[in-house]
Design a protein with these regions (language model features):
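Mid-chain, well-packed structural core segment of small domains
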Residues: 59-84
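Terminal, low-structured helical/coil segments at or just beyond the last alpha-helical repeat
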Residues: 1-4, 92-118
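Helix-start (N-cap) detector for alpha-helical repeat units in TPR-like alpha-solenoids
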Residues: 4, 38-39, 72-73, 106-107
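Structural signature of tandem alpha-helical TPR/SEL1-like repeats
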Residues: 16-29, 51-63, 85-97
Length: 118
């Protein structure tokens, strides 16, 4: 296995154990090696979000959408980052996109309804 994959798995393991700050260390190293890998950026975005580094999480999810514009989870996660930063109008658009690409998701629908009602 490659060192990049090992770093990615290490980051995922830290996330699974609730150690998001430690996950960022491994995932940042993995991202430097393979910056075009959406799975690495997603895990890093999740880690940043969990430690309330919302603008950094936002950047990761935006980059995923540059690579994969129809990624429903990236739209949802970006919406959450934007909402946490008080950018509700922009969050609505990403929640709508997430719901469009995955209409069966109750989580996406609830997030959209909540931000629209705020």
């Amino acid at each position: 296995m490659s060192e990049t994959y090992d770093l990615f798995r290490q980051g995922q393991e830290h996330l699974a154990r609730g150690r998001a700050a430690q996950a960022t260390v491994a995932l940042e190293k993995a991202k430097r090696r393979e910056p075009e890998k959406a799975s690495i950026r997603e895990a890093l975005g999740i880690a940043y979000f969990r430690i309330q580094r919302f603008s950094e999480a936002e950047a990761e999810f935006r980059e995923i959408l540059e690579l994969q514009p129809v990624d429903h989870y990236a739209h949802f996660a970006l919406g959450r980052c934007l909402e946490k930063q008080g950018k509700r109008d922009e969050a609505v658009g990403h929640y709508r996109m997430a719901s469009f690409f995955r209409p069966q998701s109750e989580d996406y629908r609830r997030a959209l309804e909540a931000v629209e009602a705020a």
